[in-house]
Amino acid sequence: PAAVTELGGNRCKVFSASVLGATTSAAPGTILAAGKEGIQVACGGGTVLRIDELQADGGKRMKAADYLRGHPIPVG
């Protein structure tokens, strides 16, 4: 099973993600960080979700850090 989202204008399936202990006041859907630790996204209730593994349309399943090497996503 996977969730589907859009990252940097690309449709992606999310296969692995974790809710972090951190909180945020950013609007849901805001990219908080994108790097070797994965992609951190603001969610409802001030929670933060880290995307760890994903698959872009037409691509192969990979770690988020590997995806970011070819598809940088701006924070904000």
Regions found by a protein language model. Give the residues of each.
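Internal anion-binding site segments
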Residues: 1-76
